[in-house]
């Protein structure tokens, strides 16, 4: 079983994030975001990751958003924004990305994400759906959403 952990905001995590920057693309970089948040080891962190041994191999950021200010879901309910999900090369296709998304789904809140880098097939397998584009709301992004009810609507035999 793959364990998802809340990542500490500290210099060790900063060093781990540098490995992602070496392989990833700039828009997925969390270095600056982490540097801005380094305060103390026990600070509440929006970063989650998966370790293989002592090496961070997959990560994402997850934020709770007040739905009243950014309506993606009916009743303008609060939701999670899942950002910058990334798995290091050599560790891809082992279920780490799926484990991170399933962890986010375990909060039983709607989720919004903005897919990157030819990842539509992955998000489709995870049962995320496109939303009707709204220029004022989406500002050039192409968000995908998931709602807990979406997984309950799946037919028997399908997997999330």
Curated annotation (Swiss-Prot):
Enzyme class: transferase
Swiss-Prot/TrEMBL keywords: Acyltransferase, Transferase
UniProt-recorded Gene Ontology molecular function terms: acyltransferase activity, transferring groups other than amino-acyl groups
Ranges annotated as spanning the membrane: none
Domain N-acetyltransferase intervals: 7-151
EC number(s) recorded for this UniProt protein: 2.3.1.-
InterPro entries per UniProt: Acyl_CoA_acyltransferase (IPR016181), GNAT_dom (IPR000182), YlbP (IPR017274)
Matches recorded under CDD domains: NAT_SF
Domain of life where this protein originates: Bacteria
Disulfide bond residue pairs: none
Pfam families linked to this entry: Acetyltransf_1
Protein name: Uncharacterized N-acetyltransferase YlbP
Organism whose genome encodes this protein: Bacillus subtilis (strain 168)
Annotated gene: ylbP
């Amino acid at each position: 079983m793959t364990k998802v952990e809340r990542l500490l905001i500290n210099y060790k995590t900063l060093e781990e994030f540098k490995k992602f920057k070496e392989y990833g693309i700039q828009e997925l970089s969390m270095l600056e975001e982490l540097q801005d948040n380094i305060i103390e080891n026990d600070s509440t962190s929006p970063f989650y990751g998966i370790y293989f041994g002592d090496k961070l191999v997959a990560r994402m950021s997850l934020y709770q958003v007040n739905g009243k200010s950014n309506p993606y879901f009916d009743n303008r309910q609060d939701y999670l924004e899942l950002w910058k999900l990334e798995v290091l090369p050599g560790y891809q296709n082992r279920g780490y990305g799926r484990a991170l998304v399933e962890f986010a789904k375990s909060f039983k809140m709607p989720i919004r994400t903005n897919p990157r880098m030819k990842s539509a097939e992955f998000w489709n397998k995870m049962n995320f759906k496109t939303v009707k584009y709204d220029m004022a709301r989406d500002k050039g992004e192409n968000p995908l959403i998931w709602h807990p009810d979406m997984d309950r609507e799946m037919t028997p035999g399908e997997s999330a």
